[in-house]
Amino acid sequence: MKRKITALMLALTTLTSVSAVNVSAAENGYVEIFVSPAGSDDNPGTADKPLKTAIAARNKVRELKKSGGLGEKGTVVNFREGTYAFSEALSLNEEDSGTEESPITYRAYLDEEVSFIGGVDITPSAFEEVKDESILNRLVDRNMQGKLYRVNLFKEGVKEIPKPYLLGTYSYWQVAGTQGEGDCVIMADLVEALGYDRKAAKSPELFVDDELMEVAKYPNSGYLSIEGITEPGPFMRNWNDDIVGSSDWVAPADRIPTPFRFTAKSISERLKYWQTADQAIMWGRWYYDWATQSVPLAKVNPESCEITSAVPSAFSIRTNQAWYIYNLLEEIDEPGEYFMDQKTGYLYYYPTKDMSSIKSVVLTLLDGNVVDIHNAKYINFKGIDVGRSRRSAFNLENCENVHISDADISYTASMAVKIYNSTNCTVKDSHIHDVDGGVEINNCGDRANLIRGNCGVENCEIDNFARLTKTYTTAVNLSNGCGNYARNNEIHNAQHMAVGFSGPYHEISFNNIYNVCQEADDSGVIYTGRSLATHWGSVVKNNYIHDCTPNVTFRIGTIAVYLDDFLSGVTVAGNVIENMQLAGMFSGYNNIWTNNIFINCTSNSVVTAFSANISAAGLRPTLIDGWKAATYKTNDAWKTAFPALYALTEDNLKNDIVTTGNVVANNYSWNSSGYDIIETMRQSPDNVIKDNVESVRDPGFVDAENKVYLLKENAQIFKDLPDFKPIPFTRIGRYEKRAQERISKAVVMTIASPYVFVDGEKKMINDSEQEQMPVIINNSTYVPLRFVGEAFDADVSFDDATRQAQISNDEITLNFSLDDLAKVSKNGEEKALENPLRVIGGRTYVPLRAVSELLDKEVFWDDSGFIAVSDTENLFNSEADGSMIDYLRNKLSMY
């Protein structure tokens, strides 16, 4: 129906208010500070005279706090659209804290696009074409004349070019203990002796017109393979003191860190060029696919086609393993490649387009996190994109109630967000992508006393992570601590694992995880391991883990949930696992696998219990020493929560022929293999292995063809497994899609915000008047009359002669008298309004519930101030849909 807005709107602007209601931000209890790239730090920070930098805004908040000028309900720092480059971190501490009643919020103003970056601008016009023959002759590609450019970074104000950071999980490995006589050589010592600092930030990266360029490497895509080996170097894992007594253990006196040497005859023509590459680095999966390591190049012999490293590989090397070489001028041969010469200060670049058309060049030189928060409370970051950082976008330490939401975090060289030693801190409703890692929650909560940290990652999409380190760098890592969570996230596209955890009472739930572990064997999508005592009470439940198959030759393959090396005390329940090799692998004590569905898993088993006792696995020192040191042994909280753990004795651990307390029951395997439970575990009366179905019959899904794995009420699975509990499959993953479906035919709003959703589309109640928003008067919600007409697709008109406003659709006509605000007529029948019309700021407001019900609509109200109006009764349930309501309310909220 065509909407009609007539002279009513002009008439309403002249009416006198009958109820004084405060609607401006300041009058509503909020103080607002404004920041703009076009501002000045000498300005007062008002809307018309904004500040220029985030640091100046922080200082303004400090001034207001000291003078008692913060808002009663909160203080908001509004960033206007643009990019804010940080030469130093935005550091917040205790003096920057808000309170529960009055938090401090840093936000993008009115959904404008705001970016924080840890980079500096390099003048595009400062680049000059390279004509020096001595440089061009170093390049493998002999046709680079007129294509290569360079800029002197020292002349651009860059004081120092840091030595490259060695990428890879094992590049700085602390490999040895202190048993025996002699010095202990560790990998970190070897590379630091060459000037590679393990504590340094990652290498600076180059962005041209907001796109990431790539350090010169060979090959440009894919990998080379180790062809022949002339010196494998030591297997340094055998230097670790956790295998003292083993025949493999190497005593300190015998530890010789010999670099490795291999042949590369297939690329013999290139090797002569590499002789001048004095800053080149080789990356490889030198022995195991999960053990990535970068090593400096030491020597190239073109005659013998031998390549020698400067330090050993952590695990020696073997043939056919993947490697490549990077950080060398000689291999610039593709548009977008660059090389920073640490010695001369020149940045060499092969542009992707005409150099004269380039508008911006940014080099990430900030040696720190973009936002650093220590010992602070009640701070929010909302709607701000953060990235291009050599470390993290956000680093939180010893914080409480710090929340990051609605952010786009990208191109960090470390974890996107680090949360350490904190409580009630969250990352929500955000997109984290093209980062080295996602979110690390470390030591949050009191593990010794089982007090939950309640820090979490929720409703985020995390993809294309581990872009630099490749392995053991996760989308979410719940490390140590107690009681933290990762839920309702969508995680995809990575070479190795998605989620790691250690510690008790962690929850990994309702996540949709796919297309990870793409280039690693013996890897887990959700992985943890090697602890008897510290992980009890953690749960992996109601996740959809699917379509993760490695692109490498594998011995074991990819495992959906991998409880490695006698990890104990974890529950895995209610998961749907599809198109994997193995659904699960475990050993340990008191692990529970129940109520899971496995679909099209290709290995010879879906769940494997791979070892029965610690001695057989050769892990006795590590596991038993860790068990002895566990803090739970002297703590009543642990004794009460986990009596089975408390009952374990050292005699059990050393002499048990089988681990106990395990449950594998009530699982359904469809078009997959069976259950490979080691016989001693299966036969033990102290383990429960039963009611596990293998079937080629559809379990009874609502729509298996379209992967809707919700179970029908009469599903076959309930006949085969009467105790099987329905898995809430439609609640898995991010809220966004489900929320959009839920509100696709509804009007959704929240108190004190000008934003609304109308049939799923976000808009403002009045684009030209931000102050128009739902307000509460005498416990009734009021909204502008004009908005009601527009939102419900009705005609709105005004009769000058009768001074009546009208809202009408095909079935209902409502007439309001502007001379009697307490009455309304519906289809000619006069009715009294319990709450009369109000005039606020020259606009007529109507009681939302009354008018909605007169239009035969249903109104849902949540105590948070969230309101939904639709044709559906009980469109939401405050308890069951609490997280979705919070998500939608956050999308609408001004503060």
Residue map of PLM features:
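Right-handed parallel beta-helix
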Residues: 377-387, 400-413, 423-436, 449-466, ...
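Primary recognition of N-terminal secretory signal peptides and signal-anchoring hydrophobic helices
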Residues: 742-895
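Extracellular polysaccharide-degrading/modifying enzymes targeting complex plant/algal/animal polysaccharides
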Residues: 30, 34-398, 620-635, 651, ...
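Hydrophobic core
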Residues: 10-18
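Extracellular beta-strand solenoid repeats
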Residues: 78, 85, 91, 105-107, ...
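Predominantly extracellular beta-rich ligand-binding scaffolds that present long acidic/polar faces
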Residues: 87-95, 99-105, 569-706
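Sec-dependent signal peptide cleavage junction
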Residues: 17-27
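Short glycine/acidic-rich loop motifs that flank beta-strands on beta-rich extracellular proteins
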Residues: 88-89, 390-395, 413-420, 436-442, ...
